[in-house]
């Protein structure tokens, strides 16, 4: 298995090392191994030579089965938006990572801000390359009293359908329920396309129950009845917002993993923890590597290593449930890896 590894900045290097440790432990005895290539991408490289992501970088990344990312950014030295647009979004569009996958699980032992959350275990399938993030907009008469700015949400049948099909496939593997989240009563054109696509594709997945929530109602249900959700499919902007809410409901983004996926398999998909680079604690050995480890499990699952993914997720669940509150980065990774060897 050939993995491109982007440790990135801050705690990214530390948590990625533990993720790889656990992934190798999960593969032990299978006859398979992980071959890694490290890429110096992120704030450090940008500050050193002004480069973000070159054509040579992209060509080299494409030679791998998948990409494991730690975290990038340093708000102390790089202005907001530079790395997001020039590195992360560029990679997403060029490598056609049209699916953003975000599992949301409330693990035993983790405190939710909800008084009685019940069992929380759902995934959000967010469209990643269209919508309001497609970059279709502009401004005129800037810095005048008559300034005009617009951002156009771009939604294509092709783009919507491939994400909807991916969501239905995931629903078939899970509890067989899919919820479309949008705002069809106001966004009648984009919302109409999403609703019609879901209705039509649903005819091929008759064992999956389908329902619909306006985005505002979905945020209410996520804090009053999160167990109602199994697979949520939604557009780029709504998905960006609702996944952060899902992270908060399940104890914070420190445990949240994500996948940026080319569902066709043409390009390598990328997996990363949702948390940032946390430069304030970098090098102290206290960063929680759990989200990075769970990102490794997502990577395995994407590549068909279901048993290994299941084993990592079970090991994480057991470890999180038995923690005493203190975190040492290397100790957590070693403990989870050793539990897979036993």
Swiss-Prot record:
Q: What is its main location?
A: cytoplasm
Identify which cofactors the protein needs according to its UniProt entry.
Answer: Mg(2+); Mn(2+)
Give the metabolic or biological pathway. Answer: Amino-acid biosynthesis; L-leucine biosynthesis; L-leucine from 3-methyl-2-oxobutanoate: step 3/4
Q: Which residues bind substrate?
A: 92, 102, 126, 216
Annotated TM spans: none
- The UniProt site entry described as Important for catalysis is assigned to 133, 183
> What GO molecular functions are on record for this protein?
3-isopropylmalate dehydrogenase activity; magnesium ion binding; NAD binding
Q: Which PROSITE patterns match?
A: IDH_IMDH
Tell me which EC number(s) this protein carries: 1.1.1.85
Q: What class of enzyme is it?
A: oxidoreductase
Q: Name one GO biological process term.
A: L-leucine biosynthetic process
Annotated residues for binding of NAD(+): 276-288
Subcellular localization is given as: Cytoplasm
Alphabetical keyword list: Amino-acid biosynthesis, Branched-chain amino acid biosynthesis, Cytoplasm, Leucine biosynthesis, Magnesium, Manganese, Metal-binding, NAD, Oxidoreductase
- Annotated binding of Mg(2+), by residue: 216, 240, 244
* InterPro entries for the chain: ICDH/IPMDH, IsoCit/isopropylmalate_DH_CS, IsoPropMal-DH-like_dom, LeuB_actb
* Cofactor binding notes: Binds 1 Mg(2+) or Mn(2+) ion per subunit.
HAMAP family per record: LeuB_type2
Concerning its family, UniProt says: Belongs to the isocitrate and isopropylmalate dehydrogenases family. LeuB type 2 subfamily.
The record describes its quaternary structure and partners as: Homodimer.
Functional note: Catalyzes the oxidation of 3-carboxy-2-hydroxy-4-methylpentanoate (3-isopropylmalate) to 3-carboxy-4-methyl-2-oxopentanoate. The product decarboxylates to 4-methyl-2 oxopentanoate.
PANTHER family (UniProt xref): D-MALATE DEHYDROGENASE [DECARBOXYLATING]
Q: What is this protein called?
A: 3-isopropylmalate dehydrogenase
Please tell me the species this chain comes from: Corynebacterium kroppenstedtii (strain DSM 44385 / JCM 11950 / CIP 105744 / CCUG 35717)
Q: Name the gene behind this protein.
A: leuB
């Amino acid at each position: 298995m050939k993995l491109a590894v982007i440790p990135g900045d801050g705690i990214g290097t530390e948590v990625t090392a533990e993720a790889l440790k656990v992934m190798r432990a999960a593969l032990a005895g299978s006859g398979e191994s992980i071959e890694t290539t490290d890429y110096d991408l992120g704030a450090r490289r940008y500050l050193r030579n002004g480069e973000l992501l070159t054509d040579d970088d992209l060509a080299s990344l494409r030679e791998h089965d998948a990409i494991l990312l730690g975290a990038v950014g340093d708000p102390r030295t790089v202005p907001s938006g530079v790395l997001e647009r020039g590195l992360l979004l560029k990679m997403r569009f060029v490598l056609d990572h049209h699916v953003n996958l975000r599992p949301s699980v409330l693990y035993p032992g983790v405190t939710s801000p909800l008084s009685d959350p019940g069992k929380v275990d759902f995934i959000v399938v967010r469209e990643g390359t269209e919508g309001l993030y497609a970059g279709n907009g502009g401004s005129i008469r800037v810095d005048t009293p008559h300034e005009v700015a617009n951002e156009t949400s771009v939604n294509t049948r092709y783009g919507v359908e491939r994400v909807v099909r991916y969501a239905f496939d995931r629903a078939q593997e899970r509890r067989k329920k899919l919820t479309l989240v949008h705002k069809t009563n106001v966004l009648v054109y984009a919302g109409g396309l999403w609703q019609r696509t879901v209705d039509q594709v649903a005819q091929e997945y008759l064992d999956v129950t389908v329902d619909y929530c306006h985005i505002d109602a979905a945020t209410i249900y996520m804090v009053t009845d999160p167990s109602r959700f199994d697979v949520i499919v939604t557009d780029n902007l709504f998905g960006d917002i609702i996944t952060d809410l899902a992270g908060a409901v399940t104890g914070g983004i420190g445990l949240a993993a994500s996948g940026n996926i080319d569902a066709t398999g043409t390009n390598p998909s990328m997996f990363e923890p949702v948390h940032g680079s946390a430069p304030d604690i970098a090098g102290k050995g206290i960063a929680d590597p759990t989200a990075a480890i769970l990102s490794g499990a997502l990577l395995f699952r994407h590549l068909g290593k279901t048993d290994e993914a299941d084993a990592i997720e079970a090991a994480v669940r057991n470890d999180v449930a038995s923690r005493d509150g203190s975190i040492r980065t290397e100790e957590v990774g070693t403990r989870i890896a050793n539990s897979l060897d036993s």
